[in-house]
């Protein structure tokens, strides 16, 4: 047994033996822990006393032995260690005692009078802030509330930094739960309402913490305080205004927007609210685009200006800020971070709800520039000219990223419904692969695949452009072409080139696109038994990818033919057997329309094929029965 294990178990005889064998009574192990630390951590007061009598614990300890003892609730060990502690370095221990509910230990520490820091120099109290405070669960404020309310009316000999910490914990509690403690602390003038506390290497303040949590009631109380500084910055060096905007649903209500407007202010020029490692403004900008009104959008622009780089482009467009937009696009030093697709989707949803011709004209100007520079897909401009804000949303997502369900659902209606019941041929591949108006699928990029700030892409934006152009001469053909692009964009594959010979139904079946299969089967123009040059039908494609729901949907079609053969002579039952999905085999057999006499090009029927190929026994048995 080594000295560390002996200390942990409180074995004084073993500790003595280890020391006699030459062990260092204060020597750390490979993790930097001393024998005294193990005795404290395990709650062994006699072992602690014996080790200290041998000189242990004289040097600095990391972590603090007192904080370890407090964290375990060992009051007797706290009393033993206290005479050897430096109070200015033990403020975390007192915070821990109150936070964990060990209030008797907290009373013992406070009664020493050492935590009032009356004799401290200014630099000493600053060290309390720089040392930082422990991060705690959001419910810890309740322990501080109980501790302070029970001692209400007493003059606690504590330095202000402890009340500052209590105020911060109260503002960080979820759903305004800490409001009563906030009002009590401010009413008693205990804390500094503008205090800064280091948590996990980041400065936090009560105002910014409440904003980050979206605690509107607490925010209103803090804003009304006569000494509040609305420009003070906390985590990420952000003011409360940005933290509130980034909080989910914080500005979804009018009250939230009112408080956001009260928090807003104009920053000094060149003030950066982001660092070089990570753009943190996406959540704030997304909420503003979704819930903010024009005034709030402009307040964000006034605060952030060019510090967000291209990330702010959708906000500038919506606010019709021509000068700011021109500066961002022309600035060589602008951040190359691209706005996420959701920003552009929210901007399109804004145009769908409101007839903002000025902002739409500016959007068109920007789109023309980006299309001309081959930064954006030409389909975006076509959709803008047609004011088709539902259809346009898909094109802002890269091919490697499937658009959200709400985006793809909108593109199916109403244009696609019209297409289904038109006279267009929906069974062949693209009927006009090289015709006029055909978009070149080979060069469809992500909306921002390149940085528009290079010198070769300087622009001068007009304040407004006409937002509409003549409709396509053949709307059905135009819709069909656009839908083909939507399909390849949504499913991240470019299958509708001129050389692609699959019909849309086969493609949808193979791509597991059940909504599109259902939509196509509603059209009288769709041939459910269409065979491509390899004689494969949509049913064969669905079975090949083991998509049982789509197979079942196709089998329910009144015109389905289960016994069509591909170029190798294989029917649907061959595909199902080879695919190894017993449920699909049983589904086909259950129709009672399977022709088991059909032979493939090798002269084998499906039962003979299954035995020769040594397929699963359950498959062979199902076919034999």
From Swiss-Prot:
Coiled coil: none
Keywords: ANK repeat, Repeat
Mapped ANK repeat ranges: 1-27, 31-60, 62-89, 90-119, 162-195, 202-232, 500-530, 534-562, 568-598
InterPro entries assigned to the protein according to its UniProt record, in alphabetical order: Ankyrin_rpt, Ankyrin_rpt-contain_sf
Recorded metabolic or biological pathway in which this protein acts: Secondary metabolite biosynthesis
Gene3D superfamilies, A to Z: Ankyrin repeat-containing domain
Described purpose of this protein according to its UniProt entry: Ankyrin repeat domain-containing protein; part of the gene cluster that mediates the biosynthesis of oryzines, natural products with an unusual maleidride backbone. The two subunits of the fungal fatty acid synthase oryfasA and oryfasB probably form octenoic acid. This fatty acid is most likely activated by the acyl-CoA ligase oryP to give octenyl-CoA before the citrate synthase-like protein oryE catalyzes condensation with oxaloacetate to form tricarboxylic acid.
Designated name of the protein: Ankyrin repeat domain-containing protein oryK
Protein's organism: Aspergillus oryzae (strain ATCC 42149 / RIB 40) (Yellow koji mold)
């Amino acid at each position: 047994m080594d000295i560390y294990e002996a200390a942990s178990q409180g074995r004084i005889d073993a500790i003595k033996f280890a020391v006699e064998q030459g062990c260092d009574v204060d020597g750390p192990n490979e993790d930097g822990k001393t024998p005294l630390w193990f005795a404290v951590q395990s709650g062994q007061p006699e072992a602690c006393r014996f080790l200290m009598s041998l000189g242990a614990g004289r040097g600095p300890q990391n972590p603090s032995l007192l904080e370890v003892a407090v964290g375990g609730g060992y009051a007797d060990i706290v009393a033993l260690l206290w005479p050897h502690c430096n109070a200015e370095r033990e403020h975390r221990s007192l915070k821990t005692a109150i936070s964990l509910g060990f209030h008797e230990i907290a009373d013992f520490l406070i009664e020493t009078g050492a935590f009032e820091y009356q004799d401290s120099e200014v630099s000493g109290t600053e060290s309390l802030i720089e040392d930082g405070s422990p991060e705690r669960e959001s419910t810890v404020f309740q322990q501080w509330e109980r501790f302070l309310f029970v001692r209400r009316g007493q003059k606690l000999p504590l330095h202000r930094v402890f009340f500052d910490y209590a105020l911060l914990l109260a503002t960080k509690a979820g759903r305004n739960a800490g409001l009563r403690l906030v009002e009590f602390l401010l009413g008693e003038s205990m804390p500094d309402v503008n205090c800064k506390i280091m948590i996990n290497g980041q400065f936090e303040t009560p105002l910014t913490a409440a904003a980050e949590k979206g605690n509107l009631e607490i925010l209103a109380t803090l804003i009304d305080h006569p000494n509040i500084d609305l420009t003070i910055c906390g985590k990420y060096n952000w003011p409360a205004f940005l933290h509130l905007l980034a909080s989910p649903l914080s500005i979804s209500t009018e009250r939230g927007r009112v408080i956001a407007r009260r928090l807003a202010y104009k920053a000094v020029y060149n003030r950066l609210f982001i660092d070089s490692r990570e753009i943190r403004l996406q959540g704030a900008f997304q909420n503003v685009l979704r819930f903010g009104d024009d005034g709030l959008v402009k307040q964000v622009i006034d605060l952030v200006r060019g510090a967000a780089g291209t990330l702010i482009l959708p906000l500038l467009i919506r606010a019709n800020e021509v000068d700011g937009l021109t500066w961002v696009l022309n600035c060589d030093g602008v951040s190359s971070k691209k706005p996420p697709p959701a920003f552009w989707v929210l901007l399109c949803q804004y145009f769908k709800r409101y007839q903002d011709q000025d902002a739409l004209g500016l959007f068109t100007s920007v789109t023309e520039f980006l299309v001309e520079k081959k930064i954006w897909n030409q389909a975006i401009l076509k959709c803008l000219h047609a004011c088709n804000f539902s259809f346009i949303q898909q094109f802002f997502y890269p091919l490697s990223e499937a658009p959200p369900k709400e985006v793809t659902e909108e593109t199916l209606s109403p244009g696609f419904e019209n297409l289904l019941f038109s006279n267009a041929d929906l069974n062949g591949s693209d009927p006009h692969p090289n015709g006029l108006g055909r978009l070149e699928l080979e060069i469809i990029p992500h909306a921002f695949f390149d940085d528009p700030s290079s010198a070769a892409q300087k622009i001068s934006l007009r304040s407004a452009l006409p937002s509409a152009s003549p409709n396509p001469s053949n709307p059905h053909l135009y819709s069909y072409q656009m839908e083909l692009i939507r399909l390849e964009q949504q499913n991240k594959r470019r299958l509708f080139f001129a050389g692609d010979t699959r019909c849309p139904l086969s493609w949808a079946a193979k791509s597991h696109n059940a909504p599109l299969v259902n939509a196509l089967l509603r059209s009288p123009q769709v041939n459910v038994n269409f065979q491509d040059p390899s004689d494969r039908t949509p049913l064969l494609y669905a079975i090949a990818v083991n998509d049982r729901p789509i197979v079942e949907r196709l089998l329910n079609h009144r015109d389905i033919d289960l016994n069509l053969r591909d170029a190798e002579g294989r029917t649907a039952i061959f595909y199902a057997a080879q695919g190894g999905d017993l449920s699909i085999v049983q589904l086909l057999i259950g129709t009672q329309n399977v022709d088991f006499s059909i032979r493939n090009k090798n002269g084998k029927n499906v039962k003979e094929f299954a035995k020769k190929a040594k397929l699963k026994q359950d498959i062979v048995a199902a076919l034999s029965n």
